[in-house]
């Protein structure tokens, strides 16, 4: 619990313009899913509906003994140890979420990859399931997939997406 409080503290985090832009894209019907490695719940807080959290969420906790779930202050009646519903180093990802992420990637005609170095596996590996026309990478640094992308934008994701949504609303 001390590690979670100290190292994985998400208190005070708020959605930014990038999160809000994704909500707007979802409302326009052009965004079908958000697949994220983040564990901060900011996509849901901002209003996205179909969020696939590959690494889980610090907002959900569960009992290792009986499986009962609760929030951060959850204390299980069975006396079991509770932990956050996040994938820690060396643990397997939730297969149901992985399967849905793969399905969404296979169905997408455009994939926006943002704010990731694409070096964390197995998440970076899932790009191989994308069969669509447009791979767009928005990142402030180079990635190993830049050469395969239709468009690479080296800038801040929040700024780029805010401007993109602004332009889409004009058309």
Residue ranges and their predicted role:
Residues 1-171:
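Conserved catalytic core of sirtuin-type NAD+-dependent deacylases
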